Every structure is written in C-alpha cells, then in structure tokens.
Amino acid sequence: MWAGLLLRAACVALLLPGAPARGYTGRKPPGHFAAERRRLGPHVCLSGFGSGCCPGWAPSMGGGHCTLPLCSFGCGSGICIAPNVCSCQDGEQGATCPETHGPCGEYGCDLTCNHGGCQEVARVCPVGFSMTETAVGIRCTDIDECVTSSCEGHCVNTEGGFVCECGPGMQLSADRHSCQDTDECLGTPCQQRCKNSIGSYKCSCRTGFHLHGNRHSCVDVNECRRPLERRVCHHSCHNTVGSFLCTCRPGFRLRADRVSCEAFPKAVLAPSAILQPRQHPSKMLLLLPEAGRPALSPGHSPPSGAPGPPAGVRTTRLPSPTPRLPTSSPSAPVWLLSTLLATPVPTASLLGNLRPPSLLQGEVMGTPSSPRGPESPRLAAGPSPCWHLGAMHESRSRWTEPGCSQCWCEDGKVTCEKVRCEAACSHPIPSRDGGCCPSCTGCFHSGVVRAEGDVFSPPNENCTVCVCLAGNVSCISPECPSGPCQTPPQTDCCTCVPVRCYFHGRWYADGAVFSGGGDECTTCVCQNGEVECSFMPCPELACPREEWRLGPGQCCFTCQEPTPSTGCSLDDNGVEFPIGQIWSPGDPCELCICQADGSVSCKRTDCVDSCPHPIRIPGQCCPDCSAGCTYTGRIFYNNETFPSVLDPCLSCICLLGSVACSPVDCPITCTYPFHPDGECCPVCRDCNYEGRKVANGQVFTLDDEPCTRCTCQLGEVSCEKVPCQRACADPALLPGDCCSSCPDSLSPLEEKQGLSPHGNVAFSKAGRSLHGDTEAPVNCSSCPGPPTASPSRPVLHLLQLLLRTNLMKTQTLPTSPAGAHGPHSLALGLTATFPGEPGASPRLSPGPSTPPGAPTLPLASPGAPQPPPVTPERSFSASGAQIVSRWPPLPGTLLTEASALSMMDPSPSKTPITLLGPRVLSPTTSRLSTALAATTHPGPQQPPVGASRGEESTM
C-alpha cells in the first residue's frame, strides 16, 4: 500500500504541468524608416516625387541599379533587350514579337467586346504562367522557372517569374542569372589593408599592428611588452604607434640594426678641438724654504746668464716630481723668465704673479727641503702646498686647467693628466662654456642640437621621423601601401597608382564614360576599377506607344505624327480609358492619367534601395529595410542570426535589411575536444588524445606507459597509475606486469584461504565472500556501510525500531592474544545497530565465552522450530596460532530471542549481517522478531546439512 501511494505521488509530480515557456523571437518593434537618399547609377530621372528609374527601366533585383529594360507589350517568344525593344527568334527587333501559332493561338480564342463591337482574342497567359487544362476549364498556372533556370546563386520562384539571389559578397549581373564577386574593399571596410576574395574579403594590418577582434580595426602592437626571451631591444624599449625605439644604457651605443647595443671604448678622450697634446712637457714651480735656490727638472739647465726662479721656488716636470738640485746661479730671474716663456701657459701676466704674497713678504714656507747651513732654523714637517702657473694650491687639492687637464697637489708635487670622457650615447652634445666632455642630455644630430624628447625630421627627409632620447637618436620611415589606391594620398611621403579599368584591350581612367564594343547605343562607365555598361538613356516621348517609330541606325524611338484620339488605348485588346481617367496599372507605386492628346502620363513613387535584402510588404509601394531581411526566400527579423544556406559553417545576421555572414564561433570548454567529420566545430564529448579518437567513457592505456590508465569524460582525459595491492611481505615484480605478486614459496593453503604468512586476513583471487561469490582482491581501510532502509517498506522499519528498544546492550569480552584460545574461542556478541540504520555494519563482535559443548544460540521458545546449525568456514594461518571463521549466509528466519539476523536486501551479495548475543526476550519482542523475520524472508529456508550443535556453539 505504501509503495503504491509513493508511486502515485511520483507520477502526479511528474505529470504536473510546468510554467509555460516563453520564447523570445528576437523581433524588435519597428523603428523609423531610413531616410531616403537619391538613387545613383544610369537611367535615373528626377520627378516631382524624387529620383527614380527613367521610363522603360526598372531596378535590378541584385544591385538595385536601373539596368532592367521593360517591354510594355511583352516580347512573346523573344527577349526584351531595351525599353520596348524585343529581340525575336527570327533575328528581327521590334516592339513585340509575333506568335508562331494561328490567329487564335494554341488554346483558341476568347470573344472580347467593348464600345463598338466584339472580336476574338487569342487565349494567352502572362509571362511566367502556362495554360493548363483543368476539370473546370483552362487556367493559367505559375511556372517554376527555378527548375530550368541557370541561376548561379539561390533561385527563388515567384508568381510569374523568379528571383536569383546571390550569397554574401556577390551581386547579380545584368543577365539576372550569373553572380559576380563584389569587391568589398572598395567601401574601405578595413582600417589599413584589405584583400578581396570570391564572396568575401580579409583585413590585415601593417607591421607593428595586429587585427582587432572585430576583424576590421588595427591595434598598435606594444613590442616593448614581449617576454624577456623575446624582447626586441637589447637595453631599453620605447613603444611608438606602429613601431618602437631602442635606447642604450650609459656607456653603450646603438648598433646599425637599431636594436642591439655595443659598449663604447673604455676611455674616449674629449673632442680633438679641445684636447690637443702639448708639444712641450709641462713645467711647474715648487716652493723652496730658502730663497735664491731654484730646482730644475732633468734635461733643463738654466741658460748662461739667465736668472733662477724666485726664492723658495723650484720647478718640476709633469707628472713625476723633480728632486731639488743644490745648484744656484746669480742669473736665476733671467732663467726663470726664459723657462716660463718656453712653457705653453695661457696667461701672459705670469711674471707679476710668480711669487705668492707670503713669499713677497719674506715668510718662510714649510716645504720638504734641506737647510742650506747649520745656522738655518729647523722647520716643522707638514704637507707642502704647490705653486703652479702663478697660483698657490693647497696640498691634496684638485683643479682643472684650461685645455681639459685635471691637476692635483700632493705634498708640494703637482700632477696633471688629460681629462678622460665617457661616451654614454650615440649623439652627445659637444662641451660648451669651457667644459671638457660632451653631454648626453640632448642630442647633436646633423649639426643641430636637439633637446631631450624632441621629435624632428632630418634635413631633406620630411618623411622620416626621429626622436632624441638620452643622447641617442632613433629614426623611422613611414610604410607606404603597395598597389593602386582609391583616393590620392594625403601626404607627399607615399605615392600610388590610381585605379583604372581595362575593357576590350584599352585602359580607361576612373570615372570615364565610353561606348562599349563599338555599339553606339551602349554606354559604359569606369567605376573603382570595374566597367558597368548599360543602354544609352532615351528621352521620354510625349506620344503614345502606337506612334513610336525606330529608324535604321537609331538607338531611341521617335514619335510619328499624332492622330486624334478620344481616349487612351493601353493594349491590343482595345481597352481604352477616357481622357482625364486616373488609375493604377497594378503597381501601388505608380499612378497614371489619360491626357487630352491620348497619351498616358504616369508618375511613379521611386523607392530608394538603402539595403540589399529588404522586406516587400504586399500592397506597400517601397520595400522596408527597418523590419528585417528577405534572404533565400525567407524573412528574418533584425538581429536574428541564422546559418548560411551556402555554407553551414557560416553564421549570418540580419541588420536592417542587410545580411552579414561570418565564420561560426566555436567555444571550446574542454582540453581534448574531438572534431567530427562534417561538423563545423569540435565537440566536448569524445576526446582527441595524441591524434587518436577516444570515445566518451572509454578507458585506455598509454603506449609508452602501459601501467597508466586513462579515461575520456566529455573531452577531458584523466590518467592514474594502475593500483596495486600488496598481498605479501616480499612481493616480486614479473617482467611485463604492472603490479608485484607473491613468490611461489607461499603455501597453496595460504594462497587459497587468503592468509598472509603473518596470520592476517587477506582476500586472494581464490577467496570466497560470505555468500560464496568470487571476489576480486580488496584491501580496505574501512568497510562501507550497508544500504539505508528503503522508504517503500515502512512497516519493516518500524518493527526493527520496536525490536531494537527491547534488546540489551552489547556485552563484549576482550579478545585474548593470538594463540591463547583454541578453535572454539571465538563467540558472538550483540551488535548495537540494525541493517539499514546509520552506522550499521556487518561485523562480528566477540561475545562472552561459553564452555565447550554448551549451546550458544538457545531456542526462542518452546515449540519454536530449531534454528539451523551454522557451520563456519575455517581458515588456518601458517603458524596455526589463530583461527578466522567465515560464516555462510544465514536464513532470515533465525531471528529468535537469543539471536537475530536482519537483512534488508534479499540479494545474497549485499546482505548485511547482524548477530546478537544470547538474551531472553520478552513475549512481545519474540512476536515482533517472528513477524520481522517473516516479513523479511517470507519463504522458509532449510538449514544446511551437516551442521552440528557443537559447531554452532563455537560461534
């Protein structure tokens, strides 16, 4: 009953109707109509209603240009080649072509009556219809021209004709059958480069740019953000639009490749105009403590009669010091003057400053020199200053001499050397204002000093742009597009060849108008490299059609002399409209009036073709671009996407009467997708792993790793090592196996019973489960719990709960050490949980010990059937120290007051076992136990043969 109620509730829940699905059609409310624009192309005339096709011409279905001639009276078996000009099968041309049938035609005549009488008119059908005999008479039925047409695109049959539609990127030719490629590049859809292809085009970018995700725009490539291993500059990189500039660190300069840097020489002298070597060695004066005792440098002796240096002054050669010479001469002043004059010193007034003020006042300078006599006072030792080129310098002082010499004084000795300049850039600025070394703060390029960061063009190179950065100048030149150009370039840096047209062996400039192929009645125009030809437009005639005459060699009709008329005749059937009658000839865009001279004047509301695939609404004059698109005979709403008919891997979208197609975007959400044959995108079901197809859910091994097992799950591959179970202490790995195995020394009994040499229980390949089923090797750290109680058996679950409340707690005795008991030392105890309850597990708990031969499982009550004996399957270890009993499955009726066995699942392989220790149950509990056993297993079970009470007591 409970199961039936649950099943009914599930069925009702499944059959309950859900909320109605709300589909989104994608249609948007119609917006404003696009503003009409003036029609362009040949055969366009202006009227009071705007611009439109001239009389005798109609817009083509593909491009919308006025290139489709109209023959008002039909051409019959001929073809309309010009307004009201038919080309007949016999080679003649005229306003119409004669029928080949008799006066009444193939299907007889109809009697037509009007104002003056009746006449027989041949039964004919309009163009695009055929006469068909039906049960109710002869009817005109539409002809499916698509069956026999030579349309290169998609043919759509219409009432009385057909429409040949070309795919995206193609346009219908003037013959209304063939499709020609549309050069989309003429509309400049690409920002930089455009390459036309059949039915499509491809945008590309110049070097230094990459294509944007919209496939039209170009984005600057920041070359300076590349990874370290792919960097473009050796040292520093500065990104520019479409390019980059490289600079070098101080001490390096840019090589000719403008990318790598090279080190300057370790020492580069200042410019030659500043640092010129002297032709004579430098001399300097050293002060002496005594006056009148000059010291000369080696190789320089005072000339005869020349005065020596002033008192307390000595001379020395640079850079090595010169020892003081103990010689003197009465002509020291003359010698000093000649020596100073021979030395290249920039100042000419040195003689007035030879002696410092301290010497002129008679002071004694503390310089390291020996006294002249014993009467001389001893001077305190200390650092001696230096007298150099008329100036006194303290010891350990430094100064720069004119000529870029660096000098320093060290204890009375002056040392000078050339200033060494480090060239840290490629275009340094020469030193100014007495400086010695060039500067890298700015650039000196082509004789002009540029400030830091200046962008300039070299002389006579206006198309080259240079930039000054840290004394380095980097220049780039613009890239000029190759091939012809649509418009003249805006700068003088690039030149291109203008677009021309090649037609019948001659070249024509863009926009040129010429006659085509010697036919004076055909006018051709060169537009954007393509030639478009059409018949020469003819002036509108003021006479009715019956008065048109085409003379020999003429391209247009002329009017003959008018004849008096009382109305306007429209066709050969004699239908006339009175003067002043206004009517619509079946076209909602055209209104006609019968004028007094018998001519018909029609005014047409010309429609502007603002889109290639508008929706034509019946009864409406102009097609509608704002409502959606008409494509391949179907109507699509704005922003509606649909697969292309010509290529299933293209996805098209309708946008205000235009259809744009692009490749299908394939989102890949897995690592190993598989690309089925004939599909546009890979799918994440099967896997493509290392070039081979792996079915979903298939488990396979790797060729180079046979011990690795992999699984394909919805495009993802997960691999793991083959798990191995250690069944013995000393495993051995055999060649070709993934897992180790036990050696052959293991006894057959141990291998069969699943016991290791250490006495532990292990299920081997020969082991059996509790129910006798063959099981695979297992090694579980914890055993899973039994299945939970099924809600479809609430009565059984209630009985189990009532029975549990009447049971005692489990009495457990500690297990004796291994080998302390014999074969009968293992007893059963009372478990605390039932199968189906949380925490229940089919385990054996040791109970209180019983004497040998005493029955462990007593009868439930007098007269109750005896429980069948239970015979355990014993397994002996190698040492025989421990006995492990494996119990066969017990029948469900053995639920007595002493023991109970609850099994929720009747299947032998999944039966959890709960053994209860001996206890005297109450009558109510006994009856519940009996009812529970009967409910679980209604059928009686026979006890196994050969079981003894003694074997049962060992439990």
Swiss-Prot record:
VWFC domain location: 384-441, 442-502, 503-560, 566-626, 627-685, 686-743
Signal peptide: 1-21
GO molecular function, one term: calcium ion binding
GO biological process terms held by the UniProt record: cellular response to virus
Tissue localization of expression: Expressed in liver.
InterPro entries the record matches: cEGF, EGF-like_Ca-bd_dom, EGF-like_dom, EGF-type_Asp/Asn_hydroxyl_site, EGF_Ca-bd_CS, Growth_fac_rcpt_cys_sf, vWF_C/EGF_Fibrillin, VWF_dom
Low complexity: compositionally biased ranges: 311-329, 921-936
Name of the featured protein: von Willebrand factor C and EGF domain-containing protein
Organism of derivation: Homo sapiens (Human)
